[in-house]
């Protein structure tokens, strides 16, 4: 209870009613946000006192909430109040907050030796089925730390769990998917391995193709690696994807929770032909999330560095590198002034320039992301918008007809079954073909940068990037305009090339014809006009989920050609690297312990979904196992199974990847 001998209004800051100690619980209406937070803080203190605890001598949850409530309050009272309790947090012991005390504990692996206890009282991974009412905030299981909003918002927390021996368990394996009417939750865990890259150095590397006319490139390779979760197959099993595309008319990601835990840091010791792997209890790994996208983008769609599809596969993290400039424009040939000016402006990004955690064996980090993006629609149009009419009813529309082969003309009434429409095909470019050979690294259409005065020797390929592909919504005329990708079955050396099939939606594969009195000619290039109608490109389980929309002053309609979701702020890249541990040498040359780190990474995503509802009487097509293939060592194993050698049988055709927009009919 507050002291009996106190001033009636309490010891508050001038102009405030609650911001200060010993004021009454009902002192009138709070004057601002800081005063309102102080009122709530006083009520919490009163409850703690009634329970027999003294909140004035210990830092407690009420103090933590008060700091959090004022984190964006820049008033004088808010700053003073927040600063006071931050100081209290630093010097006062915690009141009954075991987790906070545990996080303060310095985790050496031997510190918990022999301390293994029953985990019945510990929170289990969220493996129970979640109903709609149980999903309160559209998020997977979250850490206790606060969450920053925004598409790329992320927070990290370091903590640990109980364990024994030389390892400290900081979490269990999570997996499986849960389906409700409004949300689907996917949960996956993989074992990962990260090693020292570039001997802890940054390097500039030139990538020069064997064909002198091809695209050369300049790359900055770094000592960092990273995690990439950008593919549907990393999150949905084939059966889960089958269920998603068979039962829901649209879906989109809403929240993602990533946890990196159960870290084990090993030192590699070589003694002649013998190699020993020892636990290193004091070495560390650096880890942070680029939630603000301050560093060049690493997760390009269709890269092979994504989280493995199979839960038992080890995820070997790729090295991070980025392109600092167009190499052809920065060679400074013949002292070219333009190229010299470009070369002098090349940026250099060092990831050590950001705050980050340094974790040791037994510690963990967690990150949260919020998505703000459009839907992936799964319905197909069974007719084009030009046929949205009743063909039995006559129309009042008439048209001007020019007779074949002469200049005579007449006006006639439009037939009921051929009524005109206001809706036009979507845009696209088809009047080009790819330039060979393969080593030239070119595409049917190229977009580049060519500053006046620069000297370009390698041709357009040297300063250009290819569209992928530029068909838009138009019907592909050549293979250049079809989305294609390679599938590399695990454990084999056979690459399979998958080519997209027709999407079966009448708002894709569109064509535009122009009459010339005697016939019609195909318009290969269709620009953007009013009243164009089209559907986005259909995705499959093998597609990337998102792509980062470039930062620019202006842009037209955003519609990635591969169906991925363009995002201003996709999930920030989570970077990781081994800590640098120098060792002495005779000539003071750089020498470091040879270490690596392995651990578990779990990724939980909440997907917002809508079930389909239809008045269609007839059965509709659905994805089934009957459309899959047979393969493997003896050609007896079905797709998405393993053969006698353990090789995973991957799909070999577009339909085996279960594309969207092929099953559920929609009424336009």
From Swiss-Prot:
Gly residues bias: start-end ranges: 147-162
Catalytic activity: a 1,2-diacyl-sn-glycero-3-phosphocholine + H2O = a 1-acyl-sn-glycero-3-phosphocholine + a fatty acid + H(+)
Residue numbers spanned by region Phospholipase A2-like: 11-66
Annotated GO CC locations: host cell cytoplasm; host cell nucleus; T=1 icosahedral viral capsid
EC identifiers of the protein: 3.1.1.4
Span list, region Disordered: 107-162
Record's keyword annotation contains Hydrolase: yes
SS bond list: none
Residue interval(s) of motif Nuclear localization signal: 611-622
GO biological process, one term: lipid catabolic process
InterPro entries: Capsid/spike_ssDNA_virus, Parvovirus_coat, Phospholipase_A2-like, VP1/VP2
Domain of life: Viruses
Keyword Hydrolase in record: yes
A GO term for molecular function: structural molecule activity
Keywords: Capsid protein, Host cytoplasm, Host nucleus, Hydrolase, Lipid degradation, Lipid metabolism, T=1 icosahedral capsid protein, Virion
Domain notes: The N-terminus of Isoform Minor capsid protein VP1, VP1u, contains a phospholipase A2-like region. VP1u may play a role in the disruption of host tight junctions in the airway tract.
Purpose of the protein: Capsid proteins self-assembles to form an icosahedral capsid with a T=1 symmetry, about 26 nm in diameter, and consisting of 60 copies of three size variants of the capsid proteins, VP1, and VP3, which differ by the presence of an N-terminal extension in the minor protein VP1. The capsid has a channel at the 5-fold axis and there are densities extending the 5-fold axis into the interior of the capsid. The capsid encapsulates the genomic ssDNA.
Family: Belongs to the parvoviridae capsid protein family.
The name this protein goes by in its record: Minor capsid protein VP1
């Amino acid at each position: 209870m507050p002291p009996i001998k106190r001033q009636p209004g309490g010891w508050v800051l001038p102009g405030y009613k609650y911001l200060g100690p010993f004021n009454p619980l009902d002192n009138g209406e709070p004057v601002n946000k800081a005063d309102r937070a102080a009122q709530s803080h006083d009520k919490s203190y009163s409850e703690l006192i009634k329970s027999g605890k003294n909140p004035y001598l210990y830092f407690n949850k009420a103090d933590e909430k008060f700091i959090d409530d004022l984190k964006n309050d820049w008033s004088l009272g808010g700053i003073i109040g927040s600063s006071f309790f931050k100081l209290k947090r630093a010097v006062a012991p915690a009141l009954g907050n075991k987790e906070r005390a545990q996080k303060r504990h310095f985790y050496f692996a031997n510190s918990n030796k022999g301390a293994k206890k029953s985990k019945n009282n510990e929170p289990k991974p969220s493996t129970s089925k979640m109903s709609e009412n149980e999903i309160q905030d559209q998020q997977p299981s979250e850490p206790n730390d606060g969450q920053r909003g925004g598409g790329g918002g992320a927070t990290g927390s370091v903590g640990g769990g109980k364990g024994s021996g030389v390892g400290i368990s900081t979490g269990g394996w999570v997996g499986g998917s849960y389906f409700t009417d409004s949300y689907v939750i996917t949960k996956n865990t993989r074992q990962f391995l990260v090693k020292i890259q570039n001997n802890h150095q940054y390097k500039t590397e030139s990538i020069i193709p064997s064909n002198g006319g091809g695209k050369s490139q300049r790359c900055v390779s770094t000592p960092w690696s990273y995690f990439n979760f950008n593919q549907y197959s990393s999150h949905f099993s084939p059966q889960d994807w089958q269920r998603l595309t068979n039962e829901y008319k649209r879906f989109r990601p809403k929240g993602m929770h990533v946890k990196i835990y159960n870290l084990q840091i090993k030192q590699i010791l070589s003694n002649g032909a013998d190699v020993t792997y020892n636990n290193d209890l004091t070495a560390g790994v650096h880890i942070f999330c680029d939630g603000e996208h301050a560093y060049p983008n690493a997760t390009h769609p269709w890269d092979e560095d994504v989280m493995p599809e199979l839960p038992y596969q080890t995820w070997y993290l790729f090295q991070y590198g980025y392109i600092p400039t167009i190499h052809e424009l920065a060679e400074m040939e013949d002292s070219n002034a333009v190229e010299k000016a470009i070369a002098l402006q090349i940026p250099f990004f060092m990831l050590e320039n950001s705050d980050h955690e340094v974790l040791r064996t037994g510690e963990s980090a967690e990150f949260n992301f919020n998505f703000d993006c459009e839907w992936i629609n799964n319905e197909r149009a069974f007719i084009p918008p030009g046929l949205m009419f009743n063909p039995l009813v006559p129309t009042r529309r008439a048209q001007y007809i020019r007779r074949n082969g002469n200049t005579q003309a007449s006006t006639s009434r439009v037939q009921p079954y051929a009524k005109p429409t206001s809706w036009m095909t979507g845009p696209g470019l088809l009047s080009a073909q790819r330039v060979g050979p393969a080593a030239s690294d070119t595409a049917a259409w190229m977009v580049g940068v060519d500053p006046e005065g620069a000297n370009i020797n390698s041709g357009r390929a040297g300063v250009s990037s290819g569209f992928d592909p530029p068909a838009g919504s138009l019907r592909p005329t050549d293979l250049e305009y079809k989305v294609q990708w390679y599938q590399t079955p695990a454990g084999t050396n056979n690459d399979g090339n998958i080519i997209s099939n027709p999407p079966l939606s009448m708002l894709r594969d569109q064509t535009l014809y122009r009459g010339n009195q005697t016939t019609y000619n195909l318009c290969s290039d269709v620009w953007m006009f009013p009243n164009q109608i089209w559907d986005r490109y259909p995705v499959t389980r093998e597609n990337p989920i998102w792509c980062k929309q470039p930062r620019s002053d202006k842009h037209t309609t955003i519609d990635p050609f591969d169906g991925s979701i363009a995002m201003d702020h996709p999930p920030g890249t989570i970077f990781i690297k081994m800590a640098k541990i120098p060792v002495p040498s005779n000539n003071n040359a750089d020498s470091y312990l040879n270490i690596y780190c392995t651990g578990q990474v779990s990724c939980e995503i909440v997907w917002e979904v809508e079930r389909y509802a239809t008045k269609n009487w007839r059965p509709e097509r659905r994805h089934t196992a009957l459309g899959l293939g047979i393969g493997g060592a003896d050609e007896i194993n079905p797709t998405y199974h393993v053969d006698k050698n353990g090789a995973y049988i991957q799909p070999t055709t577009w339909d085996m990847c279960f594309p969207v927009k092929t099953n559920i009919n929609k009424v336009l």
